[in-house]
Amino acid sequence: MKKKTVLYKYPMMAQMSYDQQELLDQLPHLDFSHFHSAFKSGFNASINAMEEKALRNAALYFPAEDVKMLGDMGGLVARMFYKASDERGAVLLDIFVFAFITDDLLEKPELRRHNENYRKLQILILKLVRNESFPEKDYPEWRNLITFSRPIFSKFQNLASPTLFHRFAFQYQEYLQGVDWEASIRSPNPVPDIETCKHVKRHLSGGQVAFVLAEFSREIEVPIAVRAHPGMQKFCSLASDLASYDNDIFSLKKEVRDGVVCNTILFLYLHGITKSLQAAVDRVVHMRKQTEREIISLINDLPQFGRDNAVAQEYISAITRCIGGNFEWCSKSTRYHVASSLPHSKL
């Protein structure tokens, strides 16, 4: 298989190339048995049962093969937001279907080859998320996406407070910028250092978006005095790191086979920090365990927030359930079907 060149802009890193086949050869020998989560998820059977209706609706607007990739979306939302009411659970499920559909659209090679169309779709996604009014005739190629999305974000805006709705839109914009960054590091562009990867992937993991939706799911709104507390901000950053590590571990095999290098495990290996993919997996699992310990310690050390303390505790609970729900879903999802050796995988 043809070698792919990866260039480094950092003075300590020399130009190098990597052989995708060499990475593929290591995949069957990887051991993930030491990969577990300290955080548990709940499960809302009512939300899970809504999946069929949500996907049937999506199938009216998108190709069958794209909708098929959304299998077990109900399971994801049911685990991450298990305390949501039926009404809010249905909205959350639709938002996740939208997010996965648009993410897959942005990943299509034919779209990436046409930079103008790629940017146009990104702008449209933001307009839809913000529930903005705009001349829909300017986007004839995305008419189905617009028709599908309008009811979702209209209902979300009606149910959410104005502050929470705008915070969601802001975090979604940050997420899309992360997606843009991910696209920029494909060969032959430079592969970033680990710290850059870590900070950007806090947005790219979707954790910050999910944490706003966690408030929505529990019908709370966390006051700025709580969210702005340094300890709470660090807690949210570490929780995003954890979600990012989980996504990287579970998606590793799929990303190697797809030629995607935006993965902490691959960054460690390609930078020469570890000598094998297994060593890189072990390093990320260790980083993950360390992050879990930091989160647990931080939760125990957070101060009381006076009259806002009950909301703060509910927020912490909602976020840890998001983490646990994401882990459990990733371990079972057919979306990562090539990663059959991962713990608890159905395949």
From Swiss-Prot:
Keyword Metal-binding tagged: yes
Swiss-Prot/TrEMBL cofactor(s): Mg(2+)
TM annotation in the entry: none
One MF term in the entry's GO annotations: metal ion binding
Keyword flag Amino-acid biosynthesis: no
EC number(s) recorded for this UniProt protein: 4.2.3.-
UniProt: Mg(2+) 3 binding residues: 247, 251, 255
Any single biological process term in GO: terpene biosynthetic process
Motif (NSE motif): 247-255
Binding sites annotated in the UniProt record for Mg(2+) 1: 103
Site (Plays a critical role in the stabilization of intermediate cation): 100
Signal peptide: none
Binding residues for Mg(2+) 2: 103
Short sequence motif named WxxxxxRY motif, residue ranges: 329-336
Alphabetized Pfam families for the sequence: Terpene_syn_C_2
Keywords attached to this entry: Lyase, Magnesium, Metal-binding
Cited InterPro entries: Isoprenoid_synthase_dom_sf (IPR008949), Terpene_cyclase-like_2 (IPR034686)
Motif (D(D/E)XX(D/E) motif): 103-107
Cited PANTHER family: BETA-PINACENE SYNTHASE-RELATED, TERPENE SYNTHASE
Protein family (similarity comment): Belongs to the terpene synthase family.
Record function comment: Terpene synthase that may be involved in the production of volatile terpenoids. Does not show detectable terpene products with either farnesyl diphosphate (FPP) or geranyl diphosphate (GPP). P.polycephalum has a unique biology and these volatile terpenoids could function in internal communication of P.polycephalum, to mark the territory that have been explored, or they may be involved in chemotaxis.
Record comment regarding domains: The 2 conserved active-site motifs D(D/E)XX(D/E) and NSE are required for coordinating the divalent metal ions that stabilize the PPi moiety of the substrate. The C-terminal WxxxxxRY motif is frequently found in terpene synthases and is important to guide product formation.
Protein name: Terpene synthase 2
Organism: Physarum polycephalum (Slime mold)
Lineage: Eukaryota, Amoebozoa, Evosea, Eumycetozoa, Myxogastria
